[in-house]
Swiss-Prot record:
One of its GO terms (biological process) is L-histidine biosynthetic process. It is found in: Cytoplasm. This is ATP phosphoribosyltransferase. It is an enzyme of class 2 (transferase). Feedback inhibited by histidine.
Length: 299
């Protein structure tokens, strides 16, 4: 692949998505030598360049075709798409898949002493947020007029600082809200990390590399959601035992040496095998039950 056809991937330079994005790429076999002082890193084993930038720059870089792929939170992507649509700028991209990290929600929250009944209680109040476009769309859908206070960070302190009456901010556990005397009232947007691709037409070799990376990501995510189960089972309760294995494909059943009344079962389960399920398996005569994580899956 020529230098101009190297795959360019944008990730957050630092923050909650940066570590997980790099970890995922590493799990896919992509090796980078990251220098914290440099914004561009070159893969050691694939024709891939990594651009480490501010998260709110990533959607625009993808939509403008500057980079080919981007790891981004859906909340940032949605906010930027609304902004670009209002300015008649390119706002299209291909969402290849959601990822299993970066889950959060964009919520309205008010001080503990606020007399909140429903969303209409926010009529005419000042709301601090870093997501004015998503907030505006939600409030317009509800038919509620309000005043906004745009902040780039520390939104949760705005009411105590006298800057706003309420806030619209990202929430993960709610602990930050509680620490600042606030409580969550409405969830207006659910978000997780996702992988997006530019709509720019790609050369065949670059698109093949994108497909390879996506296939590996699918395998890594699927493996994390799956477990490999091994156990010994009596032949007389085999059907009942197989039925108990959660989300399992057709298991492999193997004979045991010198024991015609028992078999070995190997299965991949796409759901958690809880303790109560293992206890039920034991009651049906299963033994030597092993539940192991899977590092990679394909096919």
């Amino acid at each position: 692949m020529s230098e101009s056809n190297r795959l360019r991937i944008a990730i957050q330079k630092s923050g909650r998505l940066s570590k997980e994005s790099l970890k995922l790429l590493k799990s896919c076999g992509v090796k980078f030598n990251i220098n914290e002082q440099r914004l561009i890193a070159h893969s050691d084993n694939m024709p891939i360049d990594l651009l480490r930038v501010r998260d709110d720059d990533i959607p625009g870089l993808v939509m403008d075709g500057v980079v080919d792929l981007g790891f981004i939170g859906e909340n940032v992507l949605e906010e930027e798409q609304i902004e670009r649509q209002s300015l008649n700028k390119p706002s299209e991209c291909i969402k290849l898949r959601e990822l299993d990290f970066g889950a959060c929600r964009l919520s309205l929250a008010v001080p503990n002493e606020f007399n909140y009944q429903d969303a209409s209680s926010l009529e005419g109040v000042r709301i601090a947020t870093s997501y004015p476009n998503i907030l505006r769309r939600y409030m317009q859908q509800k038919g509620i007029s309000y005043n906004d206070c745009m902040l780039k960070g520390s939104v949760e302190v705005a009411p105590r600082a006298g800057l706003s009456d309420a806030i619209c901010d990202l929430v993960s556990t709610g602990a930050t809200l509680e620490a600042n005397g606030l409580y969550e009232t409405e969830v207006i947007y659910q978000s997780t990390a996702c992988l997006i691709q530019s709509t720019t037409s790609q050369p065949d070799d670059k698109q093949a590399l994108i497909n390879k990376i996506l296939s590996r990501i699918n395998g890594v995510v699927r493996a994390k959601e799956s477990k490999y189960i091994l156990l010994h089972a009596p032949t007389e309760t085999l059907e009942q035992i197989v039925a108990l294995l959660p989300g399992a494909e057709n298991p492999t059943v193997l004979p045991l040496n010198d024991d015609t009344n028992r078999v070995a079962i190997h299965a991949v389960s796409t759901e958690d095998l809880f303790w109560d399920t293992m206890e039920q398996l034991t009651q049906l005569g299963a033994s030597s039950i092993l539940v192991m994580p899977i590092e990679k899956m394909m096919g």
